Amino acid sequence: MRYGVALSVVFCIAVGGSEPFPSDPALDEWRAFSRRPEARELINWLRCHARGLMTGNRCDAVLIPRTPPLFGTLGVFITIVKGSAVRGCYGAFDHRAREAEVLLVDYLEGALVRDARYRPLLIHELESAQIILTIASRPRPAGSIEAIDTARHGVFLECDGEARVYVPAEVRAAAELAREARRLNCQVYEFNAVTIR
């Protein structure tokens, strides 16, 4: 499977580290946010915008929950999952948009329609699909994929100049991912992640 990088935007695959990550105040804010009711409101806001993007009927919902900052050192990825199958994932570690609303809707649209690796989600599938937001630290070198706790940390592979991102929501078989990384002679990195469902 091939993953693309364009304008610092990365298509991703979900997974979930070897040594503990140092404390990251920005990621810690998101970790605390993920446990509050506002996190659910954020996912509902994303669902409203997904419905609007899919039907052409604009979502007028305003992003009510005050989210922690998205900019600086954090990556942002949105994954769409239907049943146990990923239907799209899109995001980046560096962002062109500065406003949270614009950034999140852009990455949501990317996950819905710009990730050509997956069959697009149909409107009747939306209500039973999961929309997953992953907030990520910067990748750091990792010894091997087997040493990464893929339930909590993501994997970033650099293979012949191509970036592949695996967020904790997607990867089901780390061993298969490790074989692929060895076969392609990839540099392996890991990143800390907060997942909001």
Question: Model-found features: residue ranges?
Answer:
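Bacterial Sec-dependent signal peptides at the C-terminal "C-region" and cleavage site
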Residues: 4, 9-23
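Basic nucleic-acid-binding interfaces
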Residues: 19-197
